[in-house]
């Protein structure tokens, strides 16, 4: 019966049951109610699985008191330029910058402190606009940001901190960035460099590589075929290195070809009236049976369009469990053409080291069967399960098939070391003594996918043929460098995504039926080299040929030019986005002449390289401020007794501050230079890390530039405790403890023989040797420890139970 048809007392009974105490109701066999069930669970939230289960039934709701504005009514009465603070927080950054320039900047000279605050506010807003995040609002939850957006937000914090002599390491900052904004990002990174900082950037974007001062190429291949320095030097000369794949693509010797013919859609999935975030009653047709790219600048509505509109509504349509609320739509027509909609992301497949490519691809069972069929295995009665490292008697008894042991390092991070018994093979000696074609099962798991494919392809037999067929799929998706026994939790995001695509192809082989799935991929080019993209595009073509539909959110021009169909959203991000700019083949997108995607796609189709164009960079006004080079420039210091001091302290030299006691030396050195340097460095750190550090007071100054991260060495006049020593202060004692814990050898206090630990199997072998040597051993269990007294009754009790002997003070009785 529907909820709306129930009477009020029936609803109350369902919700609250027959009483207030759910435990008492349960014991009496009465209904404890839905609320009682959750009350029972809330009392057991100390258990992890209970907290995870409860999280499925929780959602965020707007506060009924402030209605999502976060402030009390009294605070809402204060306004600037006719707007309250929550109203400003809901404005996009580009609009907020214009508002500040109109209403706040003209009044900045009214107060010295206000002038500094306005300058800092404007600089951060300008930086956010510069790196392509002008569509974000300041009240936007960081939980909803993509990895690339979070990294660029952090980059603006680094720019605002004005640090120098700092090493910044960036991991693919162009993730989620449209080619329009790449030049802006490069300009921002160049400004960090000009301030005396060093940048190390992990990146595959062509324009970023060409804009680098030094390009380091690692390789030449992946996995075991990589790990070498192929090239280090000017980007323009990498093309001279024959073995460099990067050089081959940058020099034009090798290119990803434009498809000669593009597939025509068979049917369409018609979406009407879709609304979510900046999507407002969007109408669009998604072609089926082809490779479609969903493009647009950052914040144009691509991810909500694919995930919230299509994927979540597909779950509802197919009757699957949907833990998130799907986007509102008027209608979606064409579901009958699809069997399933799958979101293929880069999240880890598993988090345990026990799953491997061989297990995930379904070849490990076949490999174990082949070893169980050998003469040695049959003679010993070994079944396929004996060759499993996840269970059974064949795995190493010490590490239980893990191949490594976790070593706790106390105040340092824990490390994993190779198991000393199996030496990382995961198996016991009995399994490792079984050979097939000169290899035991540990040798096979140590082979790469490519080597194993070559090995099993040369063999005859149905099992070897099935193994080779499945390994061939892994090879085709570009995972030939993985070893069969590599733990899946060590794979990169791109490798995880390709392995998931391989699983779809493998399932197709196993079932033999051609199902029609829509596969949604959000920026699969993340972390991929040109050569990896070439391999992935071949997988896309194979999936489409099997009848699947691919909807790929991507900014990389190599993907867009290879697509059969393009849906371009925009034209801008945030409130300026959410509209369909153009649809059609890549050539039709270029011919339409609308939006930014067509402009950059034209260059790619014509074969022109992607380069950094300073004209595309929006340089903030704050970037033109006069910043002295080679010095820490302090202006307007009024902290404590300082009288508006201006001072330039040269970097890389020793500067001595002197003067009478109380003249302001410590205020200048510690309260300004040290405190401000540490505070700015802490600002660059994540909010989570900052909560564990002391927040220093911001000094009363107008401006301080050219400041590196700082360390203070002070005179501490307080006496340490009785346990404080030079060793504890210098941390020598902590490292000595760790040294003895890891390398110390225990010795018997009586005979001086070294004491060592033994595994269960080693103890069994030792007992067996002693039995052979002495003919018999007595196994004794303690009955009384550390107590004096008469225990004749205890001896008679033991005799009555059938025990043969009692030992008292090491004397047999």
What positions do the PLM features span?
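Conserved phosphate-binding elements of NTP-dependent enzyme cores
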Residues: 1-812
């Amino acid at each position: 019966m529907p909820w709306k048809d129930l009477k009020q007392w029936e609803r109350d009974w369902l919700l609250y049951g027959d009483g207030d105490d759910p435990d008492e109701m349960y014991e009496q066999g009465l209904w404890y109610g839905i609320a009682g069930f959750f009350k029972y669970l809330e009392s057991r939230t100390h258990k992890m699985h209970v907290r995870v289960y409860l999280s499925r039934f929780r959602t965020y709701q707007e506060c009924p008191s402030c209605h999502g504005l976060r402030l009390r009514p009294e605070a809402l009465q204060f306004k600037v330029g006719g707007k309250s603070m929550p109203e400003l927080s809901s404005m996009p950054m580009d609009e907020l910058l214009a508002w500040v320039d109109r209403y706040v900047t003209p009044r900045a000279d009214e107060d010295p402190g206000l002038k500094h605050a306005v300058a800092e506010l404007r600089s951060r807003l300008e930086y956010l606009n510069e790196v392509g995040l002008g569509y974000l609002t300041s009240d936007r939850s960081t939980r909803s940001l993509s990895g690339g957006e979070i990294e660029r937000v952090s980059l603006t914090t680094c720019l605002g901190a004005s640090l120098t002599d700092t090493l910044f390491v960036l991991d693919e900052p162009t993730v989620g960035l449209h080619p329009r904004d790449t030049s802006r990002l490069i300009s921002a990174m160049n400004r960090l460099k000009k301030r005396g900082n060093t940048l190390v950037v992990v990146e595959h974007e062509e324009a970023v590589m060409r804009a680098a001062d030094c390009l380091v190429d690692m390789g030449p291949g992946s996995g075991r075929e990589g790990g070498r320095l192929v090239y280090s030097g000017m980007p323009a000369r990498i093309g001279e290195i024959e073995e460099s794949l990067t050089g081959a693509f940058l020099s034009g010797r090798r290119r990803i070809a434009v498809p000669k013919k593009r597939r025509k859609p068979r049917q369409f999935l018609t979406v009407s009236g879709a609304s979510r975030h900046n999507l407002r009653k969007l109408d669009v047709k998604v072609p089926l049976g082809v490779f479609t790219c969903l493009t647009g600048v950052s914040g144009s509505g691509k991810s909500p369009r694919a995930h919230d509109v299509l994927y979540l509504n597909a779950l509802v349509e197919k009757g699957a469990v949907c833990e998130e609320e799907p986007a509102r739509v008027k209608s979606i027509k064409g579901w009958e053409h699809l069997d399933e909609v799958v979101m293929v992301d880069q999240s880890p497949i598993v988090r345990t080291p026990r799953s491997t490519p061989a297990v995930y691809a379904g070849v490990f069972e076949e490999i174990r069967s082949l070893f169980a069929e050998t003469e040695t295995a049959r003679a010993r009665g070994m079944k396929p399960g004996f060759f499993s490292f996840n269970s059974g008697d064949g795995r190493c008894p010490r590490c239980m098939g893990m191949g490594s042991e976790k070593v706790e390092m106390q105040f340092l991070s824990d490390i994993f070391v190779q198991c000393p018994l199996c030496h990382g093979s995961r198996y016991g000696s009995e399994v490792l003594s079984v050979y097939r074609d000169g290899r035991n099962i540990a040798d096979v798991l140590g082979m790469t996918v490519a080597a194993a494919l070559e090995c099993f392809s040369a063999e005859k037999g149905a099992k070897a043929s099935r193994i080779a067929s499945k390994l061939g799929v892994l090879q085709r998706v570009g995972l030939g460098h993985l070893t069969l026994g590599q733990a899946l939790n060590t794979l990169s995001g791109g490798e995880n995504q390709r392995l998931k695509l391989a699983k779809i192809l493998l399932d197709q082989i196993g079932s033999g039926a051609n199902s029609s799935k829509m596969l949604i991929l959000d920026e699969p080019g993340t972390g991929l080299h040109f050569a990896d993209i070439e391999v992935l595009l071949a997988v896309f073509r194979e999936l489409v040929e099997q009848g699947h539909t691919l909807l790929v959110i991507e900014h990389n021009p190599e993907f867009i030019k290879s697509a059969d169909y393009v849906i371009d959203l925009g034209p801008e991000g945030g409130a300026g986005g959410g509209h369909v700019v153009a649809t059609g083949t890549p050539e039709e997108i270029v011919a339409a002449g609308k939006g930014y995607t067509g402009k950059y796609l034209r260059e790619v189709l014509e074969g022109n390289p992607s380069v950094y164009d300073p004209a595309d960079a929006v340089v903030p006004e704050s970037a033109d401020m006069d910043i002295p080079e080679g010095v820490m420039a302090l202006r307007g210091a009024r902290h404590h007794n300082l009288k508006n001091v201006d001072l330039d302290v040269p970097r890389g030299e020793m500067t001595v501050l002197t003067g009478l006691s109380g003249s302001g030396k410590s205020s200048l050195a510690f309260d300004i230079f040290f405190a401000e340097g540490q505070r700015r460095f802490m600002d660059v750190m994540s909010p989570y890390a900052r909560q564990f550090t002391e927040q220093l007071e911001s000094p009363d100054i107008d401006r301080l530039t050219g400041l590196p991260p700082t360390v203070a060495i002070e005179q501490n006049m307080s006496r340490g405790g009785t346990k404080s020593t030079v060793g504890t202060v210098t941390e020598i004692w902590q490292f000595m403890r760790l040294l003895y814990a890891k390398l110390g050898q225990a010795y018997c206090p009586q005979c001086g023989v070294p004491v060592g630990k033994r595994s269960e199997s080693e103890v069994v072998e030792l007992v067996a040797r002693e039995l052979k040597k002495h003919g018999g051993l007595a196994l004794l269990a303690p009955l009384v420890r550390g107590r004096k007294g008469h225990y004749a009754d205890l001896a008679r009790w033991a005799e009555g139970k059938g025990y043969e002997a009692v030992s008292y003070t090491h004397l047999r009785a």
